[in-house]
Amino acid sequence: MIRDILSRHPDREFRRRKVQKTVTAGPIVQWVGGKRQLMDRYMEIFPKEINNYFEPFMGGASVFFELQSRGVIKGKSYLSDLNTELIVTSNLIKSGRFAEVARLINEINEKHSKELFYEIRNVDRVRTGNKKYKKTAELFDILDPVEVAARFIYLNKTCFNALFRVNGDGLFNVPIGRSEKKDFSDYGQLKSAASVLSKAEIKHASYENVLELASPGDFVYFDPPYEPVESGSEKSVGGVLINGNNFTSYTVDGFTSEDQVRLRDCCDTLNDKGVSFALSNSNAPLIQELYKSYNVKTLEVNRTLNSKGDKRKNAAKEVLVTNF
C-alpha cells in the first residue's frame, strides 16, 4: 500500500548529507523525553555492573544503548513497551531486515511533502466530515511489517517534535513538523542499531512483566509517561511541558495517577526481592510522595517541546528515584 501511495507523488530534489563511514549505535527513533541530556549523570549513578537489564517503557531505549556501549550489562537484556508499532519496528530491525526498511524509507524520502505525510499517516482511516477521521482497519491488516516499520520511522522523523500520540480511537494524530526535505534513510544507523538490539529480547508487554523475571543482581530502569506537573491545561509528558491534555496519550488508555501508584507498588515488590531499580519521572508532588521512602534526586533539564512557542526553552525539573 505504501508503494501505491508513493506512485502518486512526484520526486523532489534535495541535497543528501554525506554518509558517515563509522556510525555509533543509537535509538532508531527519537522519543519525547529522551535521556541523552541526562545520560552522563545517569551513568554516574547507575550500577557499574549489571547481570540482566530490564527497560519496561522502552521508547527509544537510549539508556539500553548507552549501557551496552559501556559494557555494563553482563547478562541478558529485556526491552518492552505497549506501543505495538515500536515493538514490531524494533524486532524487524533486530532480525536483520534493516536494509529493506531503509530502502523503503529512502523511497518515501525522495517524495516527502506535506501531502504525502498526511496520506501515509492516514492509511488506516477515512475522513468523516468536519475534519474528523474514522478508523477503517487495523494497521497490520493493510501493511506488511516492512511498511509498518518504514511508516513508523518516517512519521517519527517528520511529525511535530517526534511526538507519539494517539486519539481515543487509537489513531496516530500528530501533525507534520517542519516539512522541508530531509535525508533520514540512514542504512548505517539502522545496521548498527540492529547489532545492539540483537542482544535484547524485545516484546509487547506491560511493565509488570518484570516482576516475573527480575532477580537480585539485575537492574530495572523505568521511564513511564510522566505525572502532570500541575493541574489544568499544562501537562508534563516525558519531562516535557505540554499545553493541552491530549498530548499525554501514548496509548488509548493513557497513563493515569492511579497507574503511577500501581507502578510504585511494582517498585516496592522489586525492592522486597532485592532487585535494583531506577525510575525517571516529573517533579510532581504525587511522585515525591509515592517515592519518599527511596532515594529521590532532583535534576534540571532543558526541554524544548511545547505547543506554545514562547515556552519552548524553559528548563524543567524531573526526578530520578533509586533504591540503592
Where are the regions a protein language model picked out?
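Conserved S-adenosyl-L-methionine
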Residues: 48-113
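Short, polar loop motifs at secondary-structure junctions
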Residues: 59, 189, 281-285
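Short hydrophobic/aromatic beta-strand or adjacent loop that forms the aromatic wall/cage
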Residues: 150, 315-321
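Conserved acidic-Pro-Pro-aromatic motif
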Residues: 217-311, 315-317
